[in-house]
Amino acid sequence: PSVSYTQLMGTRPYTFEYSTHAKILKDTSWIAEPNWIHIYYPYFDANVQLTYKPINSDSSVQDYLNDSFRLTGKHQVKATAIDEKILFLKNGNVASVSELSGEVPSPFQFHITDSITHFLRGALYFNMSTKNDSLAPAIAFIKSDLVHLLNTLEWNE
């Protein structure tokens, strides 16, 4: 598909540009918290789960970072490799991204924080069996969209 983006609208504590091939859906799971959303790609039947956490006196950014690495680490059983990178983004933010190889449920994950107020984690899932070799073109397309999301992310105060 061609590449074009639109601005996330609403009153969330974050905003970014996302693919016009995707739909924003509210997270309706029983554990969902305010400002958790899904970026759903109907063409690929893929979903990016975004979980937002405010950093406040009751929590710490270190707890959220540990949770993020722990959740990524759960895939080690099926992963043939986990490639972690730090991205220094055009908007001045810094993000950590993990690319997982093998028959893993989530081949791409990330987190980004300002270390003071905001923490956002994302994980890509496909609503089908994990045949990531055949999904490689879709994974690459969505990964590119997610890097664009990270480059355009702004925190709302």
Where would I find each of the regions flagged by the language model?
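Short glycine-aromatic motifs
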Residues: A22-K23, V77-I82, L153
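Conserved polar/disulfide-associated segments of primarily extracytoplasmic proteins
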Residues: T28-R121, M128-N132
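Surface-exposed amphipathic alpha-helical segments
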Residues: A22, A123-E157
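Extracytoplasmic/periplasmic, Sec-exported soluble proteins
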Residues: T6, G10, Y14, D114, ...
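Generic detector of well-ordered alpha-helical segments enriched in charged/polar residues
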Residues: T15, Q62-T72, K143, V147-L150
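Residues that flank catalytic or metal-binding motifs in active/ligand-binding sites
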Residues: Y18, A46, L149
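N-terminal "mature-domain start" segment
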Residues: P1-A32
